[in-house]
Amino acid sequence: MKKIASLLVLLACTFHLFAQHVRNFEFRGVWIATVENIDWPSKRGLPAQTQQQEFIKILDMHQKNGMNAVVVQVRPAADAMYPSSFEPWSEYLTGKQGLAPEPFYDPLAFMIEETHKRGMEFHAWLNPYRAVFNINRSSVAENHITKKHPEWFLIYGDKKYFDPGLPAVRSHTSTIVKDLVTRYAIDAVHMDDYFYPYRIAGKEFPDQASFAKYGKGLSKDEWRRSNCDSIIVQLKKTILATNARIKFGISPFGVWRNKTQDPRGSETKGGQTNYDDLYADILLWLQKGWIDYVVPQLYWERGHKLADYDVLLKWWNDYSYGKHLYIGHGIYRAGTNDAWKNYNQIPDQINLLRSFKTTQGSVYYNSNTFAKNPNGWNDSLQNNHYKYPALVPPMPWLDDVAPDAPTIQKKSTANFVVNYNGKEKIKSFGIFSCGVGVKANTKNAQLIKLLVATKTAIVDLSSMAQKKNEKLYVASIDLNNNVSGLVELY
């Protein structure tokens, strides 16, 4: 009887999966953490070639799983995974902060190039306030900012932080971001949940001096929130003024506030919250348009007693204020309890978020977990949820101009040359499939293949499994993922 019941549940889940519309636009990302060598490089001091080989292997795995973006930590602790005039080389590359890779190369330029080759977006992940990861054992270079400006920093627990209350700190962070978006072809600037640090029981964050100087007329909590507001506004202005195409996203802790603290809060019992403990008023940032997307870290399982995934998913849908909402999934928790031993946990989370029109995708923490194919989730993504490619959803407030449609030249029965001659820059061509007799567009045609190209591409029909009673179409796709009109291919 139990076997029959289990089979019925499995069939029901399978039916539910295939009954859903497969999205042509869906963010599918993975966090790649470099701090403490969590994901990449696997250890410090590896030769440059080995570092590159490891990153290529990571990208290939995620591309196979259907991902279209990676979120890579490029500034773990006031250091850099790239040559910088402002901050030293990261110790997580070579084992010693300030020491360049050997043989020399630019890891960030390399990672961006390899990511874009695969038609994926590269989101540069920065930590705004962490300066020294561990004051007892971290390598700190002589030219590190903590030694140039020791008056900017505060020790809390075993870490050293920028003091968020200092205007000079905000200016320094803006300089770092401006340099990054000026020199590199990144697609977004991304920051996670670490604004003010998570509270340590019995210890107050030691910012009394800066509060006394700058906090006039505000409570300390209000002042701290205003400091986070100020850095977000300043960074958004910096990005817009430097390269308006680049997106700005935040990945906050999953609970903004509990309902017991605020009528707008969620039906949760979070021990710490964004608003009250990290001083990050995410809702204000969304309302004001200071950020382009939000990725709440909903790392709990469905049915969690204190922070239910289902409850929080609906809550964030209600409060995304027209900006893009992607959901952060805690796949690193695979196998940690019964809920995370259940192979349906992540598939069900994806199915549920797809039932909300305002949720536009997923980001998974962390990259290395996928190398183990936990609970067969790689197989589920490849064969079901992400079987077909998807484009990162475009952001019309940044750019809503579609590129010109491509032209087609037939070479043989199975080969076509696709050309683009428009003024708008493009990054790829999309091949779509649609039923005969249907006026094809991106809402009713299925994206089946992406060809990374800026001018010309060859379409080989023999490599595509075309169905009967369907026609193929091609379209141009620009840097903001706007799609041209579809042109009949075959």
Regions of interest found by a model, annotated:
Residues 414-425:
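Conserved aromatic anchor
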Residues 25, 33, 37-53, 124, ...:
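Active-site-adjacent "subsite" loops/lids of carbohydrate-active enzymes
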Residues 279-305, 321-397:
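Substrate-binding cleft of secreted/luminal carbohydrate-active enzymes
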